Amino acid sequence: MMRSFAIVLICYNRIGGIKRLLSSLENVDYDGRTDINLIFSIDNSGTNVVENFAKKYNWPYGPKTIRTFNERQGLKKHILQCGDYTEQYDIVVALEDDIYVSDSMYLYAYQAAEFYEDEDNVAGISLYSFQKNWLKWLLRFEPQHCEYDTYFLKVAQSWGQVWTNKKWKPFKLWLSNNPEFIKDNTIPQALNQWPESSWLKFHDRYCIEKGKYFVYPYVAVSTNCSDAGEHSKKTVTDHQVELMYGKKKYRFSQFSNQAIMYDEFMEREHLGKYLGLSDDELSVCLWGTRPNCTYKRYVLTIDDLPYECVRKFGLFLRPAELNVMRGFEGKDIKLYDTSKARNEHYKNNDFLRYRYSIRSSDYRTLARFSIQMLSLAFGDIKMKIKR
């Protein structure tokens, strides 16, 4: 028996984005189904332009529902209510109005939801695939590929996601017991800085505290057009990624220590065995985003730390952790024993990270890149001063 399937469009007042999203949904391969539920969930923006469009729109793949609100809900409250559609439908795909999907979206979403339905370590399924480090946006994110089509990341997703009741209900229960976001210096600092209107930081926090992961495709079936809206004053292309087209059958990895798995800092997990260490005594900080207050006895990093360096690796293979896994000697990645202090100075080696990430040793290019980094940093400082 086929599971019921709903697509929830999270709408406000951007009619152009809705039309673009619908044009992509019309081209999705629904495997011959004509019972795909399309839900327009429209927050109150003081205008009925989206509602009027939704009423006239003809959805060719099944029933259409329109939900409106008498009062403004705000993004956080609105999306949390959309998640509750998992009480009515077996599988729910949630899409904001600046998202665009590929024709493989349904087949991936359905197969993934079915495969991981009873896996308690999975909190949700992402349609999107990061190509940049979500904590250092100028760095690339390159997960190790394998025979399967997906990997695990301890980061929730809002740029195209799949929920089921078994995944959503535990999160809502946790949220009811944790309604306030308390800042913590052990979590990614971006979460502490996101506005109160963010629902995603709560879902991320849930994954971190409960040790749960999202399933991510290596090649995305959704992309983010980043239209101007509540969180951005202008349209940008920074979040656009390549899309998978024409794929009909996906292979999914079982959740285990042998799977490709990354934590909330986008650092590879379970590297201890390659270093002769227990994972419980190893902190991986290749990208320089892990707070040093979370360091365990051994730290694997590109930075220079004031501790005894017990091993060194090169930075040649991709992804970076593969140099450690294959034992490539060098001088760029260091393993430190924090129980043995040394009279050395800490040195941030972000320049090396960026050189590796942009795949260039051209110092003129790197100089321009450094200027851009400084410009962004000063921009952030100005914004904080204004606040």
Which role fits each region the language model picked out?
Residues 1-95, 99-387:
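Peripheral/terminal regions associated with large enzymatic or DNA-binding modules
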